Amino acid sequence: MGDVKNFLYAWCGKRKMTPSYEIRAVGNKNRQKFMCEVQVEGYNYTGMGNSTNKKDAQSNAARDFVNYLVRINEIKSEEVPAFGVASPPPLTDTPDTTANAEGDLPTTMGGPLPPHLALKAENNSEVGASGYGVPGPTWDRGANLKDYYSRKEEQEVQATLESEEVDLNAGLHGNWTLENAKARLNQYFQKEKIQGEYKYTQVGPDHNRSFIAEMTIYIKQLGRRIFAREHGSNKKLAAQSCALSLVRQLYHLGVVEAYSGLTKKKEGETVEPYKVNLSQDLEHQLQNIIQELNLEILPPPEDPSVPVALNIGKLAQFEPSQRQNQVGVVPWSPPQSNWNPWTSSNIDEGPLAFATPEQISMDLKNELMYQLEQDHDLQAILQERELLPVKKFESEILEAISQNSVVIIRGATGCGKTTQVPQFILDDFIQNDRAAECNIVVTQPRRISAVSVAERVAFERGEEPGKSCGYSVRFESILPRPHASIMFCTVGVLLRKLEAGIRGISHVIVDEIHERDINTDFLLVVLRDVVQAYPEVRIVLMSATIDTSMFCEYFFNCPIIEVYGRTYPVQEYFLEDCIQMTHFVPPPKDKKKKDKDDDGGEDDDANCNLICGDEYGPETRLSMSQLNEKETPFELIEALLKYIETLNVPGAVLVFLPGWNLIYTMQKHLEMNPHFGSHRYQILPLHSQIPREEQRKVFDPVPVGVTKVILSTNIAETSITINDVVYVIDSCKQKVKLFTAHNNMTNYATVWASKTNLEQRKGRAGRVRPGFCFHLCSRARFERLETHMTPEMFRTPLHEIALSIKLLRLGGIGQFLAKAIEPPPLDAVIEAEHTLRELDALDANDELTPLGRILAKLPIEPRFGKMMIMGCIFYVGDAICTIAAATCFPEPFINEGKRLGYIHRNFAGNRFSDHVALLSVFQAWDDARMGGEEAEIRFCEHKRLNMATLRMTWEAKVQLKEILINSGFPEDCLLTQVFTNTGPDNNLDVVISLLAFGVYPNVCYHKEKRKILTTEGRNALIHKSSVNCPFSSQDMKYPSPFFVFGEKIRTRAISAKGMTLVTPLQLLLFASKKVQSDGQIVLVDDWIKLQISHEAAACITGLRAAMEALVVEVTKQPAIISQLDPVNERMLNMIRQISRPSAAGINLMIGSTRYGDGPRPPKMARYDNGSGYRRGGSSYSGGGYGGGYSSGGYGSGGYGGSANSFRAGYGAGVGGGYRGVSRGGFRGNSGGDYRGPSGGYRGSGGFQRGGGRGAYGTGYFGQGRGGGGY
């Protein structure tokens, strides 16, 4: 095989070109591989090899490139020596026509229902078909982005990136703000004679009502439209935000000028200057280290009315990389005999390394034929599959896919398209002796869908997952064989894999495209480009109830195949029907006084519960008018469940509810009712955050006489099919996350679902017999529902997607997003670019820096990613990864009321920190589970903690650490440490300092009781779920008035969630952008005033600049963390000192009655010999907290190992448990110091002595669950 490299070199030499090879090590020390990429000038393709040694990697990369040259007819296949280069099958372009017969929806159904309730079925069949070869209309939806970026390129202005000193938003967008934008927009409307009207949508229940305003305007001089959709707590704010987005877009398109007047800022509440008690000795040390770092400090201003800026510019910058002029495309290549597409690596050993495609195809065909003849169970399953509606369309589907690069399959719920279409393709290739040419990846919107569908398909093929069918979701993979296989995965997993290209995959099937999440929209842009560059690839788009015309147009008028479902009709009813059938009378309204932040706001959106037809009785109209439209009526759901009993039609009931809180409350509500809590009912929750074992229960049949009631979010709306569901009760709501960029505000709103969502939910009934769907919204409300939900790309920050665009080398961020099916607003794109430049993730040429490359690989918010890197530098990487991972999931506290009880508050110790509470919970749980699964369950029940959340946090943390280690960070800086939250702990001080960096600009100042001030003195409240929230009207005094927080939540009031107390020195160091001094007072970010010496403040801002410079050096070469030069070590020690509360004169032990009248929390055990959770040399697993961590305990029978159960993984397992056999003890063999002589911190085994990486394999696509330690 080595000759292939010479062949390519000779071929290039004849054309006066030279192949360029780039090789790098990937993976960690124990399983290192080498990735080689080869490029040839003039060809937009990168050949790739991934092997265990450099020579094979180079040969495989050359071979891949030669195969590409054969495919594009640059080389004839017979000219190539026998390297196993296969010619692609010929591609025909015959246009295909597809069936578009009308779908019959039955209008009547039997059943014991009152005849006056029979409703007309809607006729919603409207999709036709068109030939693929017909060119579509010009696609110019992203023209605004294209215009802006083309003008920017023409000017070729080298941005000096000085906007760091400017307000994040206004300065970036021509100084247009909430206050001045609406007036300018009105002027523009008058001049252009535009009738601009805001379209308002109300979201949330009465006590948490807010509004969305949206508007589309046509710009004559550009010949295009721009669109904005923004959120506000009332109509006025929503309209102002919408106007602001429109004006900023007009500014960037050159239609309106920058604002030149004085920006009037609303005067927020002023903060009194805070006196910082800094010792003379510490100030002297600060000045010394600044001198050592050769930094110059500005003297105080001569005139106090002209303050000086203390911020020091960047001390180190990444060298700009070469600007990417070519618009990149993710590379694709067809399946090849020695390439495993699921691990993105070459097969260099074993029989498959040298097998020809013909041999592979013949072996797999013989195996399938033998199985079909001998396996009687399989024959029975095949007969079942024959009955699925999609089976009738098999030949039509296969023909369309073979003739067209892109095909859309629109199939009614339950027709079998998700499980059958991939198998049709696979079996067709195997039976036609082309097995080696087929590998199919199928994306699902959620992990439960990917796993359950993969398990179902494996069952239908008479196999276990891991043979011809597998899955890969975050934290868990069972990979199929390298050839003739189907891989089900989440969209996020596929996007992570794209860095290695879509190599070795013949078909990409994207299921549920109507969901319009940001990842699916991003994937569709990637695939559209791939199809244009590589027409041989096959893309299949599938969904149930979408208007496919937009997707059809986007993919060049591709054909649409309509598949009709089972003929069981589903009768649907609305709120008025449900009330009349059940004779429901609402209970008396609860008169309890609302909290102050739940009040206010006028509701001028019509209450549709007051609109009821004359055909309903007066009792029905009265009951309906008494129901609050914004609340989910639990009592009506109970009444419907009792009504369903009277129908005597057996079947499961699926109840759609918006969010985990309602599911949990409804479950408890039903279980406490003697009727529904009895053995006659099985109440099951279904939510993405519950363990897989719990999720699987919803598929299990129940005994005769038992009714299964499934309480689910919209997770059950798509892909997963629960066969025995006959009844659907639909709240008609769902929970969405809305983010407003200009004020950094997050809002979790319960909103009305769209008509598309309701149609999907209705379709879940009637799989086994005629079904019933009860919508808990009135007919009048249904008529007002949106047809589709707003795409996620319009309501979420874009910086994570922007990083992916750069990592995949897809060109400019704006230019790429302009190609989206519905491009995001221009101002959102510019903000994403600015955020990444500010973090040093992009260089002067807008290409990824080494830091940006690491951040792009971390599946977490980029600012948190940089915080984790800084954590590694301070050797507190594990704690920072734990906190970052915990932010991905709900809090682990199980809490009945809104405020936390003492059992949960005690985890914060005396740190006044929600983040420290999370860290302590995780630490205590991690210790408890050393005693096995039963000990873990007991601990979680006793402390009222959600075990599933803690397990998922652990998995996420391990994955984040794995990525950092694979990026070259030393394992030592990511070791687990013990923290104390009740006494001095400098490591914990540093963690809090870095947290202040990670959550910036979320800083607040405590005034009184729950009242706090956020940026620019705006009023807000401490969130009720915080450990810092006082009980009732209790007034609290904290050791420091300053806090950082995770996010601002907009309810009726604005509240800060996830709060941690910080010192003013920590703010100056890591949570500030603009620092000014007049010689007496230091002003931070224009609102926080500190009484601190000018010199001390200047030295601290200098330390920040030095720290940023060190991050630049470390990300170029992470291994240098273990051998920093003395000056940097002293600088880090200085930051450690400044991070201590005592450095700012703050005593955390002040105020022993921290949480009101309750008992003082018990002190946590000191971690000395033999006491506390981690008992020195005699730890739970027989010693070896650090040593056993990787001496084989975890992998051999660990989580996902041979025992394949939580008990085996989290408890003792087969091979000695998670922390393994006695190998040294956490503090040495007999409680010695951390790095003591008798084994020490890491024991004699070290961090990673396992024989393999178990479940994590090679990144997302892992090597299955197999052996070895972690």
From Swiss-Prot:
Subunit structure: Component of the coding region determinant (CRD)-mediated complex, composed of DHX9, HNRNPU, IGF2BP1, SYNCRIP and YBX1. Identified in a mRNP complex, at least composed of DHX9, DDX3X, ELAVL1, HNRNPU, IGF2BP1, ILF3, PABPC1, PCBP2, PTBP2, STAU1, STAU2, SYNCRIP and YBX1. Identified in a IGF2BP1-dependent mRNP granule complex containing untranslated mRNAs. The large PER complex involved in the repression of transcriptional termination is composed of at least PER2, CDK9, DDX5, DHX9, NCBP1 and POLR2A (active).
Reactions this protein catalyses: ATP + H2O = ADP + phosphate + H(+)
Role, per record: Multifunctional ATP-dependent nucleic acid helicase that unwinds DNA and RNA in a 3' to 5' direction and that plays important roles in many processes, such as DNA replication, transcriptional activation, post-transcriptional RNA regulation, mRNA translation and RNA-mediated gene silencing. Requires a 3'-single-stranded tail as entry site for acid nuclei unwinding activities as well as the binding and hydrolyzing of any of the four ribo- or deoxyribo-nucleotide triphosphates (NTPs).
Region of interest (Core helicase), ranges: 398-809
Consequence the record notes for mutating W332A: Abrogates transcriptional activation by the MTAD region. No change in RNA polymerase II holoenzyme binding
Species in which this protein is naturally found: Homo sapiens
Effect the entry attributes to changing I347A: Reduces NUP98-induced mRNA transcription and alternative splicing activities
Modified residues (Asymmetric dimethylarginine): R1166, R1219, R1235, R1242, R1249, R1265
Primary localization class, coarse: nucleus
Protein name: ATP-dependent RNA helicase A
Location of region: Necessary for interaction with RNA polymerase II holoenzyme: 255-664
Gene Ontology BP annotations: alternative mRNA splicing, via spliceosome; cellular response to exogenous dsRNA; chromatin organization; CRD-mediated mRNA stabilization; DNA replication; DNA-templated transcription termination; DNA-templated viral transcription; innate immune response
Covalent cross-link site, Glycyl lysine isopeptide (Lys-Gly) (interchain with G-Cter in SUMO2): K697
UniProt-annotated stretches for the region HA2: 831-919
Motif (Nuclear localization signal (NLS1)): 586-595
Interaction with BRCA1 as annotated region, ranges: 230-325
UniProt PTM: Methylated. PRMT1-mediated methylation of undefined Arg residues in the RGG region is required for nuclear import of DHX9. Phosphorylated by PRKDC; phosphorylation occurs in a RNA-dependent manner. Phosphorylated by EIF2AK2/PKR; this phosphorylation reduces its association with double-stranded RNA.
Record's keyword annotation contains Transport: yes
Gene name of this polypeptide: DHX9
